[in-house]
UniProtKB/Swiss-Prot annotation:
Keyword Flavoprotein in record: yes
Residues spanning the membrane: none
Record's subcellular location: Cytoplasm
SUPFAM superfamilies for this protein: FAD-binding/transporter-associated domain-like (SSF56176), Uridine diphospho-N-Acetylenolpyruvylglucosamine reductase, MurB, C-terminal domain (SSF56194)
Function text: Cell wall formation.
Encoding gene, per UniProt annotation: murB
Provenance organism: Xanthomonas oryzae pv. oryzae (strain PXO99A)
Protein name: UDP-N-acetylenolpyruvoylglucosamine reductase
Enzyme class at the top of the EC tree: oxidoreductase
Amino acid sequence: MSDTTQVGWQLSEHAPLRALNTFHVEATARWLLSVHTPEALPQALAAPEIADQPLLVLGSGSNVLLAGDPPGCVLCFENRDTAIIAHHADHAIVRAGAGVNWHALVLYSLQQGLSGLENLALIPGTVGACPIQNIGAYGAQVGDFIHVVEAFDRHHQQFVRLDAAACALGYRDSVFKQQPERYLIVAVEFNLPLLCELRLDYAGIREELASMGAELARAADVAQAVINIRQRKLPDPDVLGNAGSFFKNPLLPNEQIAALQASFADMPVYPGEHAGLGKLSAAWLIEQCGWKGRREGDAGVSPEHALVLVNYGTASGAQLLDFARRIAESVRERYSVILEPEPRIIGAHW
């Protein structure tokens, strides 16, 4: 493996990626570009080895399945600076580099007396990845608190600042997901309130708070409740390879949901993000099809949570993908519902 090091960036050849994805599958990058200073990005991207190559951005690799070696160059941002850049009477603007660990940012915001991100505690990944999927959990989504996304626009070869509206944030969606070849996120600014109405819609959070003796909850209490719940339900990717929830919860027209409930009266249904749509529980669908806790070789579904696909050791990305496809097919055959993966599939088509 040969390396090229310049001010603010480093380029490595034939770099192993097992440590850079939370499924811990084996894959190799033809080129791995590590950027420490975003200002150096245009120069780094112009390096002759990668100038015309496809580009894959990896944060902590917590939302990808490497079903094969990625083509071209893998880019990792190593800028991990976090700071409050503006104080106001009732809120503050926090800026975090793309390489900052997401959970570390949540804890930082709470330490600064800021709220809003507490329901999103312990989600794996980096700040740079959070707007792409508009990450969400327990009734909250990050898009509600994004002020500005700072990115490098590859089409116009310039740095840009996109406000929340320009980011086109939707359910697990954004302009960055819709145009993956255009924007490289280098930092995110968050508008975080000093006091925020706590999101306690999920019964599990209320029950956890009660068990903690925190009926009059603060944001930090909600974060701890979420941490407790996630640690019980979701395997630690450092111990057992996984990418958290593998499938999206399906959004369907209310008419289709009513028809399903006529046949499956115990099917749980939740409000959708838009009028006329409801949301089904992908975990419930998968469990009803008998996949929860099932294992084939080193590929399997967590016995604690039916949404979590796991690598018990040496499963390849291709094996995990095949396993996931068969789960989705069984749900389609039984319920006529299409499951879509949350992680980005690299090296193969879904």
